[in-house]
Structures are given as structure tokens and as C-alpha cells.
């Protein structure tokens, strides 16, 4: 994945730019809040919580159904298969799946779903099963970036278009898949570094709780963080890096080891909220107080943003999981023969002590 200065240049023609604008409006207006699910009234904050597309600039690549080799189809008559990668204990995955299901229901589209339960071999067989059950279109939230050849070959044989969300498949756009919809993970890492620099004063030792190996999210969030620290705060030293596998339990275990081996640590960059919340639990268990160690995380879950309100977390960089409207908007346009961007970049917000309490309703 390229950096922001390149990745925001996604759309080249006025029609495609108009499509991106429509996607942004649709994604925002279709966002669901927890109050909606309970039948309550949607808050203003929740109404603003939908995904917004980064303003497009000239220079990006697009895809059409003719170039891809698929067939035109009315989305309302299609069967869409959705493959979720991870156990839905993580609020990000819960919100992501709910968004896909809500949008399919809103549009009256038949949806088949499968959850790989964090097992890559199962995700491959899940998608193959979705194809066997008659999926005309696929939306995939990949667990890993590599190893997708069996699925790509099977989908190509049936001329089934694929849209990937959140994590990238290492394959060729407009040949193996249509579009990739995600945040700019390098930029998320940079913004996390900015918040860490502000919180620590740009001096001292910090640790990184890495996400799981084998996907672009971990690689790029790490890259962005380190680049920004090197650029703006050479006095801030990364002295510890270990994977927490994007889970709260592992994040807690790694942090317990960290504070034993590096008692002078000043900050922890957790590459998702769940690991960050695990770090908070470890600090509480060790008798630390809020603010003793600065924690910066990425995602925007309600528990993490509450952690900012409570003083345990210094900042949260949002990674919005509400992909449903954008994914279906892309599929709808594509199956009608319109050009769609090969990369659709989401514009994320952030939570700090200045806005966390006010914007808590936007969290998921």
C-alpha cells in the first residue's frame, strides 16, 4: 500500500469522482448506531460515524466490469458472499459484519456469510464454499495478505468479482480483485506517533505492541509510526517490539513482560485497541496509575475511547469498520458497468483528551 500522498490520488475521471462523492454520502447516511440496533433514536454523533472517502486527486487507477472480465448483473438479483476473517470477540469485527449485514438488508440483497474464526485455512475453504453455494459477488475481509491463489483462481473461473476490505490481498487489482477499501494504515501510524510525541514530549523509551504477522496492516502501521518518530522526535526510542496478535489477552501478557524487562518505559503504541486495553489491564495489575505510561492505540472502539476519557489511554486513531455502504456501493456501480477506483481510502478521525468525551457516541 502506498503512502497518503499517493493513495489519495485514486480517481481520474469526473464520473468516477462523482461516484466517490456518492459513496461518501451513502456511507455516512447509512451508518448504524448501537441505539439503532436497540430500536432507539440515533444520536448526532452516531449519525456522523459512517465512513468518508479521502478527497480524490487525479492519477489513480480504476476498474470496469469489461476490463475485469465479469458479467453485468442487477445487484438486487445477485447473491453476495461475505467472508469474515476473525472471531467476533473484537468490536471492530462485530461492527464490520453488522455493517455488511445491515446494508445487504437495506438493499434487499441476498447475503451468505462465513467466519473463519481466525484460521486462514478455514477462510480459504469458507470462500470456496461461498462460491459453491452460488455467490455472484464476494466481499472478503482477509486474515492474511498472502496465500489467496486457490480462491482467486476459483473466483476467476466463475467470473465472480471480489472486493476486499480492511486488509489487502497481495494480488493484481482489476485482474484478481476489483477494489480494495481500507484506511491508510501508514498514515494511521504517523498520526499515532504524533500523539505519542505530544504525550511524551518526544523523549524517552517506547514500546510497540505489533499486530499479527502476515498482513499489510501491521507492516504499515509500524512503518508509519517509526518514520514519523525518526523524523520528528529522534529522542524517542523504540526499545521493545513484540506481537500481541491484535488480541486483548496477548496484549496484556506482552505488556506484563514489558514492564518487567523495561521498567523505565514511557509509552506504548498498541496497533489496535484490543491490545491497548490489554496493556491497560497489565498496568492496573502492576499497580500503575493512569498516565504513568502513555498509551496510544488504533481503532476507535467504545472501550478504548472511554479509556481516553478515564485517563488511561492518551489517544486513539480511528480505523472505521463500517464498510457495508461503501462495499455495496462499489459492487452496485461495478456491476452496472461503471468505473470504480481500484483503491478506496477512508478518511479516519481521532480521539484525544480534548474530544473523547464529546465524541464517545461515534465509537463502536
Kindly label every feature range from the protein language model.
Residues 91-106, 188-192, 216-236, 250, ...:
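Short, solvent-exposed amphipathic alpha-helices that sit
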Residues 80, 123, 180-206, 250-252, ...:
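Hydrophobic alpha-helical segments within soluble ligand-binding/sensing domains
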Residues 48-103, 107, 112-125, 142-145, ...:
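Extracytoplasmic "Venus flytrap"
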Residues 142-157, 225, 244-306:
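Hydrophobic alpha-helical
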Residues 13, 40-78, 209, 213-216, ...:
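Hinge/cleft segment of the Venus flytrap/periplasmic-binding protein
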Residues 46, 146-187, 205, 301-309, ...:
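Flexible loop/hinge segments that line or gate small-molecule binding clefts
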Residues 113-115, 171-195, 208-210, 241, ...:
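Short beta-strand elements at the ligand-binding edges of bilobed clamshell
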Residues 27-42:
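Bacterial lipoprotein signal-peptidase II cleavage site
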Amino acid at each position: 500500500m502506498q503512502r497518503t500522498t499517493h493513495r489519495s490520488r485514486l480517481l481520474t475521471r469526473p464520473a468516477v469522482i462523482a461516484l466517490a462523492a456518492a459513496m461518501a454520502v451513502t456511507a455516512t447516511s447509512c451508518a448504524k448506531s448501537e441505539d439503532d440496533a436497540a430500536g432507539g433514536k440515533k444520536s448526532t454523533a452516531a449519525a456522523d460515524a459512517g465512513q468518508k472517502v479521502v478527497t480524490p486527486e487525479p492519477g489513480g487507477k480504476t476498474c470496469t466490469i469489461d476490463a475485469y472480465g465479469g458479467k453485468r448483473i442487477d445487484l438486487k438479483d445477485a447473491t453476495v458472499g461475505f467472508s469474515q476473517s476473525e472471531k467476533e470477540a473484537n468490536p471492530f469485527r462485530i461492527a464490520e459484519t453488522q455493517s455488511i449485514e445491515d446494508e445487504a438488508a437495506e438493499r434487499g440483497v441476498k447475503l451468505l456469510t462465513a467466519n473463519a474464526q481466525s484460521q486462514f485455512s478455514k477462510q480459504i475453504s469458507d470462500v470456496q464454499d461461498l462460491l459453491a453455494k452460488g455467490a455472484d459477488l464476494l466481499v472478503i475481509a482477509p486474515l492474511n495478505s498472502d496465500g489467496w491463489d486457490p480462491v482467486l483462481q476459483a473466483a476467476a473461473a466463475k467470473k465472480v468479482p471480489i472486493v476486499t476490505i480492511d486488509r489487502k490481498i497481495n494480488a493484481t487489482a482489476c485482474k484478481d480483485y476489483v477494489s480494495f477499501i481500507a484506511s491508510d494504515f501508514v498514515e494511521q501510524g504517523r498520526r499515532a506517533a504524533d500523539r505519542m510525541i505530544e504525550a511524551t514530549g518526544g523523549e524517552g523509551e517506547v514500546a510497540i505492541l505489533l499486530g499479527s504477522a502476515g498482513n499489510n496492516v501491521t507492516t504499515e502501521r509500524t512503518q508509519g509510526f517509526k518514520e514519523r518518530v525518526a523524523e520528528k522526535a529522534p529522542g524517542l526510542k523504540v526499545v521493545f517490539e513484540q506481537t500481541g496478535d491484535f488480541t486483548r489477552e496477548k496484549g496484556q501478557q506482552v505488556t506484563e513482560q514489558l514492564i518487567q524487562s523495561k521498567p523505565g518505559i514511557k509509552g506504548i503504541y498498541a496497533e489496535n485497541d484490543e491490545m491497548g486495553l490489554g496493556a491497560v489491564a497489565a498496568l492496573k495489575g502492576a499497580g500503575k496509575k493512569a498516565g504513568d505510561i502513555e498509551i496510544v492505540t488504533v481503532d476507535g472502539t467504545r472501550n478504548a475511547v472511554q479509556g481516553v476519557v478515564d485517563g488511561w489511554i492518551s489517544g486513539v486513531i480511528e480505523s472505521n469498520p463500517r464498510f457495508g455502504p461503501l462495499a455495496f456501493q462499489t459492487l452496485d456501480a461495478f456491476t452496472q458497468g461503471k468505473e470504480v477506483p481500484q483503491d478506496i481510502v477512508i478518511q479516519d478521525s481521532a480521539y484525544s483528551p480534548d474530544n473523547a468525551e464529546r465524541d464517545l457516541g461515534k465509537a463502536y
